[in-house]
Regions:
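N-terminal nicking endonuclease/strand-transfer module with a His-rich metal-binding environment
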Residues: 2-201
Length: 201
């Protein structure tokens, strides 16, 4: 978990211009109130690779006690093929990538199919077809599946507004893409408003 500190109560312009950086707790002024921006990364848990169904809410919300279905209508979703969408502005149901699982599968098929096919041909030539892999294999492997990051600004008792969190994280993602370029791809993310604090997966 990586923590950043953001001055609470800063004007919107200051928050939008803020560059996220690690700030040791001993440098914080006592009189200032800061919010902690927490970033948690991972690919898999005790039950295997993370399931993107939680992130785009493509499951029955009535089965989850910690999710308020009314507040879930305000969630904001983004993916690399369609951009922004929300429950209030649903996308075309005939779309090829309607869920984050579909988006991730489609991205992997577009970018990695040629590599997998050539690798599998090579494996066949050296008589090691047991090494062959497919797109579902890549998506379910702890080494090659998409990595999930969770951002939260503040705590249960005191947290930033969803708008401020959205502004900070979208700026952070742009900085991240500028720094790492084509080596790292942001496939999809979701701003969740229906749980105890606003956070982004």
């Amino acid at each position: 978990v990586i923590s950043y500190w953001v001055l609470s109560g800063a004007k919107r312009r200051q928050i939008q211009q803020l560059r996220c950086c690690v700030l040791p707790a001993k440098m914080l002024k006592r009189r200032d109130v800061y919010l902690k921006l927490t970033r948690h990364n991972g690919r898999a848990g005790a039950h295997g690779t993370y399931n993107p169904k939680h992130n785009d809410r493509s499951f029955n919300l009535a089965n989850s006690e910690h999710i308020d279905p009314e507040r879930a209508k305000g969630n904001i979703y983004w993916d690399c093929f369609h951009g922004f969408r929300s429950a209030l502005d649903p996308q075309d149901p005939d779309d090829l990538a309607a869920t984050f699982s579909d988006v991730e599968r489609q991205f992997y098929e577009t970018h990695y199919t040629a590599f997998i096919e050539s690798q599998n041909e090579r494996n066949a030539k050296i008589r090691h077809t047991e090494r062959n892999r497919s797109i579902p294999d890549l998506l379910s492997s702890r080494k090659t599946c998409p990595e999930e990051t969770i951002y939260q600004l503040g705590t249960l008792d005191e947290h930033a507004s969803a708008e401020d969190l959205l502004n900070l994280v979208t700026e952070f993602i742009e900085e991240f893409k500028a720094k790492f370029g084509e080596h790292v791809h942001v496939l999809d993310w979701a701003l969740h408003l229906a749980e105890s604090t606003p956070h982004i997966h």
